[in-house]
Amino acid sequence: MSYARIIGTGSYLPDEVITNHDLERLIDTSDEWIRERTGITERRRVAPDQTCGDLAEEAARRALEAADVSLSSIDLVIVGTCTPDRVFPSTACLLQERLGMRHGSLAFDLSAACSGFVYGLGVADQFFRTGAVRRALVIGAETMTRILDWNDRATCVLFGDGAGAVVLDRSEEPGILSTHLHSDGRYQDLLGVPWGPGQGYEKRDALGPYITMQGNEVFKVAVRTLSRIVDESLAANGLEKRDIDWLVPHQANIRIIQATARKLEMPMERVVVTVDKQGNTSAASIPMALDTAIRDGRIKRGDLLLLEAFGGGFTWGSALIRY
C-alpha cells in the first residue's frame, strides 16, 4: 500500500489588517470583549480585486517551492473552500490553469466549511492508498470577509481571509496515519449562510447571503464533538495522549482550542495558535497554522501531529500525521 507524506507547506495572508480597535469604530463592541471571548486581536481582509483563487495561488506556489517539485508532477488538486471564485468551474480548475499545471490532471473543490482542509486531506489520502496518484496539492482558502454582515457583531469580529497549502508525496512509510471525517445535518441552522443560488436570486435579499451563527450552541457542540474525535483518532492508531507532539487545531476560538488541549492533557506550549492574529479563516486556518509552525522550526521531521476541525453542517474531522 502507498501512503501520503507532507513534503512542502505554504500560506498567504492578504495585506489589510483589521484590528479590534478598527471594529470598535464600526459596531458596538470593544477590544476587551473580543479578546476575552475569542482570543482574537486582529484579522486580514482581501483587497477589492482579490479572490479566493488569488490567495490559493500564492499559498500553492509557496508550498510547491518548499517541496521543490515541478508542477507537471502534480496529479491531484483539492481546494477546500466555502467562498469559491465562481459557482462553477471550481476554484481548483481555475487554479490548475493559472499555475500552469498538466492538463488532464484531477482538480476539484470540496465544501465542508471550516473542516474543508481536513476533509481534503482525508480524500487525498484515499487516492494515495489506492495508488491512484503519486503527488497532490491540498489547499484551504477562504475570503470569509466577503460573506460577513458588518453590522452583526456576533460574526463580523470572528472571521478573516487567507490560504494555506500542502504538497503530498507518495511514500512507503505512513505520513498521514489516519483521517476521521464526520457530519451531522441536524445542526444546519446553527451555523451557515442561509442563501444559495439554487434557491433563486429573488430570495437572496430576504435570506441574506451572510454568515449566521448561534454562537453559544455552536460552542457546546464543538467542544463535545472534538473531545470525541480526539479519542477516536488515538484509538484507531493504538496511541496514547502523551504520544502527540503537536496539536494543530482549527483556529475558531481560543476557548475551543483550550478545551481540546485539556482533553489531550497537552500544555498550550504544544498547541499551534494563530487565531490571535488571523481570526477564524475557516478551511484555511489549519494549513496556515501548520505552515507557520514548520517554518519557524517548532514542528520538526518525525513529530506526531493531530489536526482537528469543526465547521458548519455540522462537519468535523481529524488527521493524525507523522511529519
Swiss-Prot record:
Region (ACP-binding): 251-255
InterPro entries: ACP_syn_III_C, ACP_syn_III_N, FabH, Thiolase-like
Keywords carried by this UniProt record: Acyltransferase, Cytoplasm, Fatty acid biosynthesis, Fatty acid metabolism, Lipid biosynthesis, Lipid metabolism, Multifunctional enzyme, Transferase
Main location: cytoplasm
GO CC, alphabetical: cytoplasm
E.C. number: 2.3.1.180
Alphabetical GO biological process terms: fatty acid biosynthetic process
Record Gene3D superfamilies: 3.40.47.10
Signal found in the keyword field: no
Active site: 114, 250, 280
Pathway(s) of this molecule: Lipid metabolism; fatty acid biosynthesis
HAMAP family assigned: FabH
Functional description taken from the UniProt entry: Catalyzes the condensation reaction of fatty acid synthesis by the addition to an acyl acceptor of two carbons from malonyl-ACP. Catalyzes the first condensation reaction which initiates fatty acid synthesis and may therefore play a role in governing the total rate of fatty acid production. Possesses both acetoacetyl-ACP synthase and acetyl transacylase activities. Its substrate specificity determines the biosynthesis of branched-chain and/or straight-chain of fatty acids.
Domain observations: The last Arg residue of the ACP-binding site is essential for the weak association between ACP/AcpP and FabH.
UniProt name for this protein: Beta-ketoacyl-[acyl-carrier-protein] synthase III
Organism of derivation: Alkalilimnicola ehrlichii (strain ATCC BAA-1101 / DSM 17681 / MLHE-1)
Gene name per UniProt: fabH
